[in-house]
């Protein structure tokens, strides 16, 4: 949609730069302006529809972040690539409600998944006796949302985190 808006602006700029000899009544210019205004309205409508869906999904999970699985089972490196390709992130719950939303996905699928824990995390949900570096350098969440040290080579449910800043 932004590409269309930019293209319309480019056409309008080219038209204005070349003068008005071929459009003495301004019909072409007015048509371009009308088209641009229509595209702006369509873009605003699309943005509103997107935000409505996002708010509805966020309301249901209690989290502004969305945790989505493609149901594949992969190791940590494959997860990183998949989430990056999807323009998402490896889950990194920063609040209890985010961890609950993440755990809900795991519980529905009956699988564990990887997550990353930030250095300055204010929220953690380590299981008793964790973290345990002997178990591995990665972190997995169980179906209850408890965190455990884990090997990065094990295959787990692919879950990516998406969040929107508008």
From Swiss-Prot:
Which cysteine pairs are joined by S-S bonds? 83-160, 138-152
Q: Which UniProt keywords apply?
A: Calcium, Disulfide bond, Glycoprotein, Lectin, Phospholipase A2 inhibitor, Secreted, Signal
Give the location in the cell: Secreted
The source's superkingdom equals Eukaryota
Q: Where is the signal peptide?
A: 1-19
UniProt family annotation: Belongs to the alpha-type phospholipase A2 inhibitor family.
The principal location of this protein is secreted
Q: Looking at the UniProt record for this protein, which Gene Ontology cellular component terms does it annotate, in alphabetical order? A: extracellular region
Residue span, C-type lectin domain: 46-161
What Gene3D superfamilies would the database entry show? Mannose-Binding Protein A, subunit A
Q: What is this protein called?
A: Phospholipase A2 inhibitor clone 04
SUPFAM superfamilies assigned to the protein according to its UniProt record, in alphabetical order? C-type lectin-like
Expression across tissues is:
Expressed by the liver.
Q: Which residues does the annotation flag as glycosylated?
A: 122
Q: How does it assemble?
A: Homotrimer; non-covalently linked.
Does the keyword field hold Calcium?
Answer: yes
Listed GO MF terms = carbohydrate binding; phospholipase A2 inhibitor activity
**Classification via InterPro entries:** C-type_lectin-like, C-type_lectin-like/link_sf, C-type_lectin_CS, CTDL_fold
Query: Any idea what job this protein has?
Result: This phospholipase A2 inhibitor binds directly phospholipase A2 in the presence or absence of calcium.
């Amino acid at each position: 949609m932004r590409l269309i808006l930019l293209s319309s602006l480019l056409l309008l700029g080219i038209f204005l730069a070349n003068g008005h000899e071929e459009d003495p009544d301004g019909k072409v210019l007015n048509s371009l302006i009308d088209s641009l205004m229509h595209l702006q309205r369509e873009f605003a409508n699309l943005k509103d529809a997107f935000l409505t869906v996002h708010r509805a999904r966020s309301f249901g999970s209690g989290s502004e972040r969305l945790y989505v699985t493609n149901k594949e089972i992969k190791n940590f490196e494959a997860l990183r690539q998949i989430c990056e390709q999807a323009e998402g992130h490896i889950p990194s719950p920063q609040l209890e409600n985010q961890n609950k939303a993440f755990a809900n996905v795991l519980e529905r699928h009956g699988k564990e998944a990887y997550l990353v824990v930030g250095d300055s995390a204010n929220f953690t949900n380590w299981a008793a006796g964790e973290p345990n570096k002997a178990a591995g350098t990665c972190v997995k969440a169980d179906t209850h949302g408890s965190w455990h040290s884990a090997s990065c080579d094990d295959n787990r449910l692919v879950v990516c985190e998406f969040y929107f800043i508008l």
